[in-house]
């Protein structure tokens, strides 16, 4: 498969922003003189006060600091809305496609301006101002985008929690950033089923200090009956009637935080990733334009949820900064039928489509029929995000969905990077199924071995980035030391991505997956420690270890090894009970796929669990278990192999 190359088609090159020669020239300039390169491209957004310094960054141990365009001031909402009003006020900014195929809305830039100002005034009336944190726990409805942009307009900092997270997870995230205001909906709709968002918010608030959350703003989505606490809760439509649709955009420093987004860490507690204003928007908008070869008039659809970073950068901020028409989808790929994605593409004449390998794999399971009954002729670029895409799924996407005429951009990036780092560019990059190909402008990947030695040429190793780029996260909220420890201490002087990769003879990168204790389930990162501590909290469980294993739909599944307390019996009923327990504690996304009851776990003599061995057994591969002589009880391994749940 690796030998296969798909050359750039002449149709992709025609009208594209860059061809191969231009990519090489721009890339060389971007790494030779980042200051000059980003000084030029920093002008792609409007500045209220122009910047004079461009890059002020250090990856040095103990002195990690990342600042871009730091003396400039700007406002993200101004850049995503106001600056477009004169030239494209009546153009559609957001196409909203509901869970039910009969529901859709077109929101123009002018209407977006009015709606965002209204939402900002509702927040301002509740004491929200510059630097205040606001938690959003919302379905995929236009009000989610209004709320994000309203916070940005005021210089407030939004912290979105994905609507699939449990009340416990929501509570810890509200607590973590100290939000006094929460915006939610009565209920969400997904695949015809209702999600009790407001009820979950009420549950979460019960777990917090009584004086933390002052206001809960509730958008009516289903009209379902929900409990409303007088003095604290208000329906958004009622609050919006009390305010005007004019609200000035507040000028903030380029380094003022725009949002906090919690992501799974390998040590259990989620990390609050902080992204700031200027550099983030420059990078999100530039990657959106070049990676998707976005052109004036294109209809662009990213299927992510705004609860993940992909939704932040590539549904809302990047596309709107570029004056694009961006599609927001409330539903799921299989409701009401497995043709839904392609029906939406035809209905709204989508030109650029960006989804996750897990969605592609699950649709692939249904065969070509549901795809082929639609036209998809409007499509030009197909993107993939969230995890490495296996070559078989890549081929299916290219051949079946794109009829071999659409360029594929297999993008690699992370919550922490703010935007895409390694990717093909449609008019420039020959494609290899399964490879993320080459770095974006200004990005300097480095491969290092376990000792930190930099590897040259074709190799396999740990993927680091040698220097900063404008979209990079600045810190972990409230814990800069954790930021340094997590990303800069393993290989001092470099940003360590936590991913392994292979670089081939053409300089193309192939991402091989996480090398730390984080698993990637359906494109969403899940810290193994988080799932383990949930399992261990169950009264019958003594110890648990969680690893990822190859799953043909999700990419990685969650495999849990569980040691029970003395006298407890492991059976199917307890398996079900533990799955329900984790779902309730963290959310459905963390549900273990396989649970193996084990009398003991493989540990070193110092008591450290040997996860490498557990991973291998979960993968049904014992050919390379490595040296087990250092284990305290080598016999444990034989039992684990004997009773494994994932037999090939």
Swiss-Prot record:
Q: Name one GO cellular component term.
A: cytosol
PTM comment: the record says:
Acetylated. Deacetylation by the SIR2-homolog deacetylase activates the enzyme.
Q: Mind telling me which SUPFAM superfamilies this protein's record contains?
A: Acetyl-CoA synthetase-like (SSF56801)
Q: Where does CoA bind?
A: 190-193, 310, 522, 583
Q: Which residues does this entry mark as bearing N6-acetyllysine?
A: 608
Q: Which InterPro entries match?
A: Ac_CoA_lig, ACAS_N, AMP-bd_C, AMP-bd_C_sf, AMP-binding_CS, AMP-dep_synth/lig_dom, ANL_N_sf
From what superkingdom does this record's organism come? Bacteria
Catalyzes what?
A: acetate + ATP + CoA = acetyl-CoA + AMP + diphosphate
* UniProt GO BP: acetyl-CoA biosynthetic process from acetate
Q: Where does ATP bind?
A: 386-388, 410-415, 499, 514, 525
Where does the chain bind Mg(2+)? 536, 538, 541
Q: Which family does it belong to?
A: Belongs to the ATP-dependent AMP-binding enzyme family.
Q: What is this protein called?
A: Acetyl-coenzyme A synthetase
Q: What's the source species for this entry? A: Methylobacterium radiotolerans (strain ATCC 27329 / DSM 1819 / JCM 2831 / NBRC 15690 / NCIMB 10815 / 0-1)
